[in-house]
Amino acid sequence: MQSSTSAVIEKTEKYGAKNYHPLPIVISEAKGVWVKDPEGRKYLDMLSAYSAVNQGHCHPKIIQALKDQADKITLTSRAFHNDQLAPFYEKVSKLTGKNMLLPMNTGAEAVETAVKAARRWAYDVKGVPDNQAEIIVCEDNFHGRTMTAVSLSSNDEYKRGFGPMLPGIKVIPYGDLEALKAAITSHTAAFLVEPIQGEAGIRIPQEGFLKEAYALCKRENVLFIADEIQSGLGRSGKWFACDWEDVKPDMYILGKALGGGVFPISVVCADRDILGVFEPGSHGSTFGGNPLACAVSIAALEVLEEEKLVERSYEYGNYLLTKLKEIDNPIIKDVRGRGLFIGVELHEPARKYCEQLKEEGLLCKETHETVIRFAPPLVISKEDLDWAIEKIYYVLKP
């Protein structure tokens, strides 16, 4: 017999570490953009597991790929080749235009991989003295929860009690080209940036920043690394958020929707002159590039292509953004976004509004305390989007 919502939450609170503060809802079933709790109540998902479910929950093609591959082989480790890794490599290489890839499992692992690659490149190729390489990042970034990722963060709460932090990191204001110029030295290995900052509240740098920052990095022989874990794969209305400024970074970091919301997989994409610094034994992952993840990822990318979800994100994102900007309420400070990646910033904490929306059957989550993030699966229909807009109007209109 299925447990009730209250029973599940009670048991979760009893045994689980308190490193999350979820809304009081239990999801036991999901399909497309709709989810259900144990009592059968339906909710429209406007979070998409932080953009990991761009293709919708339990997409039949992706689930079938999982089932088919699970009947054959799931894990070989990288001690042997597997027959799914090569087609995965080829698919992602064609998508990104990069000729060398390194697969991992989670986004944070891929960030770790990119930082390791940048540092070794700085020593082996650029000629930076040993142990003096520097990585430049932006204030309010979010690159994960591992030690490297929290060392990159400017959020003191993410760091509290976890020191000492990784050295060799400089933090500049997001979107500040002059600060980037001032931070670069002969020891700078890379500039790591989110083209749209998700956890910071869907922050978009001023127009031209990415292009100018990339050009600056090229002039100074600094790697430009784009963390597209959340903003990539159609979420922003383009394949990659960098595409809004026609920037092709030296390194892409991809994750989340790369696994179609079904299986974790991430990847660092660059060219041979960068990722070629790795040699056998210098980096690895038992599960990285496993056949199950690769088969799922190929299907996930095919769904984005075949169902034109990038184009849908662009069209419906513009529609949703326009509708949200029409809400006339003094508590709203700003409405911003690209594609189906939209933030409504308030003059007060957003949590209570997310809780009210939950009661209306719409699931979203506050970020950066005062921002409501709206990021539904890209498969959302116009009808369902209009239903969501109606609920948002009901909660946010004065």
Swiss-Prot record:
Residues recorded with modification N6-(pyridoxal phosphate)lysine: K256
Q: Which SUPFAM superfamilies match?
A: PLP-dependent transferases
What pathway or pathways are given for this protein in its record?
Answer: Amino-acid biosynthesis; L-proline biosynthesis; L-glutamate 5-semialdehyde from L-ornithine: step 1/1
**Keyword field contains Translocase:** no
What Pfam families does its record include? Aminotran_3
Major location, coarse class? cytoplasm
User: What's a Gene Ontology MF term here?
Assistant: pyridoxal phosphate binding
Q: What keywords are assigned to this protein?
A: Amino-acid biosynthesis, Aminotransferase, Cytoplasm, Proline biosynthesis, Pyridoxal phosphate, Transferase
Coiled coil: which residue ranges? none
UniProt subcellular location: Cytoplasm
List the InterPro entries: Aminotrans_3, Aminotrans_3_PPA_site, Class-III_PLP-dep_AT, Orn_aminotrans, Ornith_aminotrans_bact, PyrdxlP-dep_Trfase, PyrdxlP-dep_Trfase_major, PyrdxlP-dep_Trfase_small
Q: Which reaction does it catalyse?
A: a 2-oxocarboxylate + L-ornithine = L-glutamate 5-semialdehyde + an L-alpha-amino acid
CDD domains associated with the record: OAT_like
Give its E.C. classification number.
2.6.1.13
Of the GO CC terms on this record, one is: cytoplasm
- Cofactor(s) for this protein? pyridoxal 5'-phosphate
Which biological process terms from the Gene Ontology are attached to this UniProt entry? Answer: L-proline biosynthetic process
Q: What does this protein do?
A: Catalyzes the interconversion of ornithine to glutamate semialdehyde.
Family to which this protein belongs:
Belongs to the class-III pyridoxal-phosphate-dependent aminotransferase family. OAT subfamily.
By what name is this protein known?
Ornithine aminotransferase
State the organism named in the record. Halalkalibacterium halodurans (strain ATCC BAA-125 / DSM 18197 / FERM 7344 / JCM 9153 / C-125) (Bacillus halodurans)
| Protein's gene | rocD
